[in-house]
A protein has these predicted regions:
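Intrinsically disordered, low-complexity regulatory segments of kinases
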Residues: 1-214
Length: 214
């Protein structure tokens, strides 16, 4: 957790004047919740609408039109340029995974449609959703120990504008690019050549991931 917070703080404040700063998720705050059995580190981020894989379902054939895709790709590339040139951060990382024990869960480290998020195109939407939840709350499950599990809202209605602004998210496995990194990254069939050859990887691994995603 400490390593992730350090990465997030670096991303949030490296250079807000860089245009790509607008296309990465920034840390707003962090705090610790003391529970009956453990402490929980909590992080606060901007509320976002939906991941790119869900966003593309809004278009015919689940395909983002080329004119919109070009705009989104420009944002993603500018966000990656900010991460690489200003923050010296590689999104693709191994975290605690090893070259031998690479699991499906480790793919969270890869740049993909799950962690490219679309911002709310209208700042009024979260307020409207909160109002709806207050008046007509979704299903809740109350446990015997008094805790309540709330059903998440993941449908915020039709888009009010066709093109959203992207945010690159999920930096829990990100690593610093100040030196060559090693280890097994990415899913087997999409793995970058340098990783296959165990030759170490750096910023180009993120660009490879973007190409695979597209």
């Amino acid at each position: 957790v400490k390593d992730e917070l350090a990465i997030l703080q670096r991303i949030s404040g490296a250079n807000p004047k860089h245009h790509g700063w607008n296309f990465v998720r920034k840390l707003i705050d962090c705090f610790t919740v003391h529970g009956p059995k453990a402490e929980h580190q909590c992080t606060v981020f901007e509320a976002l609408r939906e991941p790119l894989w869900l966003y593309r379902r809004r278009f015919v054939g689940n395909v983002i039109p080329p004119d919109i895709l070009k705009i989104l790709l420009q944002m993603i590339l500018e966000g990656l340029d900010y991460l690489h040139s200003e923050c010296h951060v590689i999104h693709t990382g191994t975290g605690k995974a090893s070259a031998v024990n690479h699991t499906a869960a480790d793919s969270n480290a890869d740049l993909k449609t799950d962690n490219i998020m679309i911002r709310f195109e209208d700042p009024a939407i979260p307020q409207e959703v909160a109002h709806d939840e207050y008046n007509e709350p979704l299903a809740q499950k109350r446990l015997n120990d008094g805790r309540v599990i709330y059903l998440s809202r993941n449908d915020f209605g039709p888009l009010r504008k066709p093109t959203g602004v992207v945010r690159i998210t999920d930096f829990d496995r990100a690593v610093l690019g100040t030196g060559a990194q090693s280890g097994c990254i990415q899913a087997d069939v999409y793995r970058a050549p340098e990783s296959i050859l165990d030759a170490g990887y750096s910023y180009p691994a993120d660009i490879w991931n973007l190409g695979v995603m597209v």
